[in-house]
Amino acid sequence: MGASARLLRAVIMGAPGSGKGTVSSRITTHFELKHLSSGDLLRDNMLRGTEIGVLAKAFIDQGKLIPDDVMTRLALHELKNLTQYSWLLDGFPRTLPQAEALDRAYQIDTVINLNVPFEVIKQRLTARWIHPASGRVYNIEFNPPKTVGIDDLTGEPLIQREDDKPETVIKRLKAYEDQTKPVLEYYQKKGVLETFSGTETNKIWPYVYAFLQTKVPQRSQKASVTP
């Protein structure tokens, strides 16, 4: 597909609720690269009680943000195991010092930025309700429960996570914007930022797919499958 044989070093960025998880999952289904989520990595290290995991947990328990140097150590340590693969970083870098530290270790080829209007994200996130015992997620717009506020299988009440309440969502989006604006500007100046704008993941995805076809080999068993 005209994809270069050189390994791809990519980053995906997008606000909470931008569809970043869905797009990342589709990318790894269709293309030969490893997806590295800093959130998953953090949880794994905390569960295993590694040195970095214990350090990170101490900050989280105090309600503090994990410092840049701890996140950087975590990500770079894991990337050492992926030197033979193309990879897609998700959730790192989040700040300018993290981006600069990553640059000292690897040359980033492309940064995929999902640009979804905040109003759309707000509607998307505040429409989410969960059944706490099972973790089942409902979306009032896309997959509502049969009875408002009630889990389909157990008949138990659904709750809205604190994170999904409108006032919290607005704060999270503002915090994301403030934190990542310098990172996006940094990558823009380097000429590696590719922004994909839209309101629906299914409409953004074909453009991301077409873009990556020029960058990285497709998975052979998926090569004939339409995205």
UniProtKB/Swiss-Prot annotation:
Regulation: Inhibited by ATP.
Enzyme class: transferase
Modified residues (Phosphoserine): 37
Region called LID, residue ranges: 127-164
EC number: 2.7.4.10
Biological process (GO), any one: GTP metabolic process
Tagged with keyword NAD: no
Catalyzed chemical reaction(s): a ribonucleoside 5'-triphosphate + AMP = a ribonucleoside 5'-diphosphate + ADP; GTP + AMP = GDP + ADP; ITP + AMP = IDP + ADP
Primary subcellular site in the record, as a coarse category: mitochondrion
Residues recorded as bearing N6-acetyllysine in the entry: 34, 64, 80, 174, 189, 203
Cell location: Mitochondrion matrix
Tissue specificity field: Highly expressed in heart, skeletal muscle and liver, moderately expressed in pancreas and kidney, and weakly expressed in placenta, brain and lung.
Biological role: Mitochondrial adenylate kinase with a specific GTP:AMP phosphotransferase activity. Could also use ITP as phosphate donor. Its physiological function is to recycle GTP into GDP which is necessary for the TCA cycle in the mitochondrial matrix.
Note on domains (UniProt): Consists of three domains, a large central CORE domain and two small peripheral domains, NMPbind and LID, which undergo movements during catalysis. The LID domain closes over the site of phosphoryl transfer upon GTP binding. Assembling and dissambling the active center during each catalytic cycle provides an effective means to prevent GTP hydrolysis.
Subunit structure: Monomer.
Name under which the protein is recorded: GTP:AMP phosphotransferase AK3, mitochondrial
Source species of the chain: Homo sapiens
Taxonomy of the source species: Eukaryota, Metazoa, Chordata, Craniata, Vertebrata
Gene label: AK3
